[in-house]
Design a protein with these regions (language model features):
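Short, low-complexity N-terminal intrinsically disordered segments enriched in polar/charged residues
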Residues: 1-36
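Generic alpha-helical structural signal
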Residues: 8, 12, 59-62, 93
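Generic short beta-strand segments
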Residues: 16, 93-100
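A solvent-exposed, acidic/Ser-Thr-rich amphipathic alpha-helical stretch
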Residues: 27-86
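Hydrophobic/aromatic beta-strand elements that line small-molecule binding cavities or substrate pockets
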Residues: 78-83, 96-98, 112-119
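Short beta-strand edge/turn micro-motifs at domain boundaries
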Residues: 91, 103, 108-136
Length: 136
């Protein structure tokens, strides 16, 4: 498998892990995608128009999103992907749409994930950092 194919499989697994009907997610799948020390950051704009960010480790992300996933059908569908590689690092721009089912006509929101990966000597490609922003 090429580097691009390996990275693509990681991104596909990340989307599959968080997508599904209301209920629990299988967080053990994070090890297939992320390094243990990975960071994830959600960004938004507050009511006064100021940029905001919440940075989380893997456990923090689980705790932050589990109540939402338990109560809501949620499917994040990738709409575009660009992979840039240099040596043992890679960057992926991954556009997405959030929906209540994979083929729902109504899109709840769109955005982009900025994903940085590192080629680990034992694990292969894994996500080291990820930040996302929704369209406004």
């Amino acid at each position: 498998m090429t580097d691009e194919e390996q990275i693509g499989a990681i991104i596909d697994e990340m989307y599959a892990m968080i997508s599904g009907p209301a209920g629990p997610r299988d967080w053990s799948r994070q090890a297939n995608c992320f390094l243990p020390e990975a960071r994830q950051a959600r960004t938004w704009v507050d009511d006064e128009g100021r940029p905001q960010m919440l940075a989380m480790g893997l456990d923090d992300y689980q705790a932050n999103t589990t109540p939402f996933f338990m109560a809501n059908d949620f499917y994040e569908v990738e709409t575009s992907r660009r992979i840039d590689l240099f040596g043992n690092i890679a960057h992926v721009w991954s556009g997405y749409e959030a929906r209540t089912s994979p083929d729902a006509a109504d899109v709840e929101r769109r955005g982009i994930n900025s994903i940085q990966l590192f080629r680990h000597a034992d694990l292969g490609w894994r996500i080291l950092a990820m930040v996302w922003d929704n369209e406004r």
